[in-house]
Amino acid sequence: MKITARPDSRLRGESVFYRQALSVCLFLAASVSLAVGRDLALVSNKANAVSTITFPDLVKVSKGQTNRWPDGKSVTLIMRSPSTPEMKLFLERVYEVPESQVKEIIASANHGRMGHPAVMIVDSDEELVNKVASIPGAIGVVDVYAINSSVAVVKLAGKLPLEPGYLLHGN
């Protein structure tokens, strides 16, 4: 007895493969768009007197051009690595230069500030929130959903995250 495959079985196998490949592609596309479209927030150490900051002042802090808050505390910006997709929005809006130049700006801002850098880079939102909570004068840029009670949310240009017109809104 000779067994032969049905002519459409190969096509059915290819169809399953293409459906699975399409599913993977859609998942990856959604993941990338979520990473790029995240809403960011500014948070500060609770002992920090800063509850609101203008956009030009945020740019100065980000570039290490502001050394002290009005209350005299040293300024430290804590952020995720400029190479992470989560920071794309921040780089575009605040630094307005390519990632490689942002790294140069950060290195220049930190030059001569041993022990108290102008800008600190961390690996995760959780680490960022913990650093901001533990360093007086610290301010951080974090995914809005990583905020917890250990830090204070800072208004940017008079707006809180998720309010219409907020400058670090991801979409």
Language-model features, listed with the residues they occupy:
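Exposed boundary/loop context
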Residues: 5-7, 30, 57
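Residue-level detector of alpha-helix boundary/anchor positions
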Residues: 11, 29-30, 134
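Bacterial N-terminal signal peptides
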Residues: 20-31
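N-terminal secretory signal peptides that target proteins for export/translocation
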Residues: 1-18
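Generic low-complexity segments that are intrinsically disordered, proline-rich and/or Lys/Arg-biased
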Residues: 6-8, 21, 162-165
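Hydrophobic alpha-helical membrane context
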Residues: 15, 31-32
